[in-house]
């Protein structure tokens, strides 16, 4: 079964969504992310993807209090990303209840530090974030495109022991036009043991089933849930079917 991971993106302590990573497109869905997390848990969700968008923009973790409230008031397994750029940021994330931390920009800009984290904490706790636009890695909250090509970038980190990768196609994210299934298929063909977490573009349960059919192990979804195109009841039913 494909692992179903809803996302909570945070700006100013509120649950928001962007379109294609554009901060000007911000839409607030709920003032209280903890209530959102509790509702998800009540419908059988076990894992949550929490993104500190303020952190991503300001290059250090900002919304750790929200992370702490979610992890202390629910039993959800939380993977956390956004602004984790230093040992101190990583420590803050783990101390506030994150079970896993995603590093994206840091893996491009400071690979030595990211690899150190991988060695110290292991591939169960450190996730590689590969945010792509035209198959190039984007950094700094998706505002900048790097010269890193996706497949050489993946190869480098797979060889260093990374096992879990969240891959977001920025052109799809928040657009509700379907995920980049062909991209994910190509990644899985090349790296058969990768625990690939698809992110971006999911607009319906059909999209989730299509990813599952393509062999994608896990999916992150957000806007479709907040816009009512996917309901928590549907997610609960899908999990009960297995």
Task: Indicate where each model-derived feature is located.
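Catalytic cores of alpha/beta
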Residues: 74, 78-100, 182-218
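Glycine/small-residue-rich loop that forms an oxyanion/phosphate-binding "nest" at active or ligand-binding sites
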Residues: 54, 62-119
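Conserved anion-binding
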Residues: 12-15, 20-24, 98-173
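Conserved beta-strand positions in the central sheet of alpha/beta enzyme cores
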Residues: 49-52, 79, 102-103, 127, ...
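Charged helix-capping and loop-helix junction motifs
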Residues: 61-68, 143-152, 177-185
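Glycine-rich phosphate-binding active-site loops on the catalytic face of alpha/beta enzymes
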Residues: 84, 92-113, 169-171, 200-203, ...
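Glycine-rich, proline-tolerant flexible connector loops at the mouths of alpha/beta enzymes
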Residues: 47-65, 105, 167-177
């Amino acid at each position: 079964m494909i692992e179903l991971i809803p996302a909570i993106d945070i700006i100013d302590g509120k649950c928001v969504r962007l379109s294609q990573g554009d901060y000007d497109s911000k839409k607030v869905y709920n003032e209280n992310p903890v209530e959102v997390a509790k509702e998800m848990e009540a419908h059988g969700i076990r894992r949550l993807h929490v993104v500190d968008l303020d952190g991503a923009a300001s290059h250090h973790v900002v919304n750790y209090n929200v992370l702490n409230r979610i992890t202390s008031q629910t039993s959800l397994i939380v993977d956390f990303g956004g602004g984790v750029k230093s040992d101190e940021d990583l420590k803050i994330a783990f101390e506030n209840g994150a079970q896993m931390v995603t590093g994206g920009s840091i893996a491009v800009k400071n690979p030595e530090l990211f690899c150190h984290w991988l060695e110290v904490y292991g591939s169960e706790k450190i996730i590689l974030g590969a945010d792509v636009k035209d198959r190039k890695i984007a950094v700094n909250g998706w505002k900048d495109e790097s010269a890193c090509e996706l497949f050489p970038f993946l190869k480098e980190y797979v060889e260093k022991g990374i096992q879990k990768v969240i891959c977001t196609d920025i052109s799809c994210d928040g657009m509700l036009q379907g995920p980049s299934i062909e991209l994910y298929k190509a990644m899985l063909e090349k790296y058969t043991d990768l625990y690939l977490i698809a992110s971006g573009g999911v607009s319906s349960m059909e999209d989730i089933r299509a990813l599952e059919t393509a062999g994608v192990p896990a999916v992150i979804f957000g806007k479709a849930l907040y816009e009512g195109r996917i309901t928590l009841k549907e997610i609960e039913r899908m999990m009960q079917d297995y």
